[in-house]
């Protein structure tokens, strides 16, 4: 089972970015499916089904003291031909949450992939983008059915709850 842990921006945030990109295009460009737009927190790779309870427990424990986190999509970049929107906001809290997760704690650029094909207009639109702020309030464990056509299934989701020992008050 191919797994990753992600934050999913709310529908209105994804729609705003999609509109911004579509408005910038003079010709159609293939974007990734908007309903699957997410910010990967940790890629867990292939895991035997019998390890799912242990993985779920670890992700749930991370969520229990990891948020909520105020974020926004802003700016952009690319990894090869893949184009992405950047993530801005409370990045210290974002990285604290990421550090609580199993695996995936090497070098990392928070991002949301919008296309796997480089396109100058989309790249320019991403660089100029500053989306609305939103609160990440849920951490999701996702099964990627990569071999069966790039579908995603939500395995489990946990509310991001503040760490009671942290002393910070989450902003809504």
Annotate each language-model stretch with its function:
Residues 1-172:
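Histidine-dependent nucleotide/RNA phosphoesterase domain, centered on the 2H-phosphoesterase fold
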């Amino acid at each position: 089972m191919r797994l990753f842990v992600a934050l999913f921006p709310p529908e209105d945030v994804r729609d705003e970015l999609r509109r911004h990109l579509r408005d910038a295009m003079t010709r159609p460009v293939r974007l990734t499916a908007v309903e699957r737009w997410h910010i990967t927190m940790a890629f867990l790779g292939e895991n035997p089904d019998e390890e799912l309870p242990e993985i779920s427990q670890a992700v749930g424990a991370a969520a229990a003291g990891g948020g909520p986190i105020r974020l926004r999509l802003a700016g952009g970049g690319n990894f090869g031909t893949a184009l992405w929107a950047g993530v801005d906001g409370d990045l210290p809290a974002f990285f604290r949450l990421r550090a609580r997760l199993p695996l995936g704690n090497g070098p990392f650029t928070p991002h949301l992939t919008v296309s796997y094909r480089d396109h100058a207009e989309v790249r320019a639109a991403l660089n100029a983008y500053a989306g609305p702020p939103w609160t990440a309030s849920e951490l999701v464990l996702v099964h990627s059915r990569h071999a069966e056509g790039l579908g995603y299934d939500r395995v489990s989701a946990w509310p991001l709850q503040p760490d009671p020992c942290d002393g910070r008050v989450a902003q809504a």
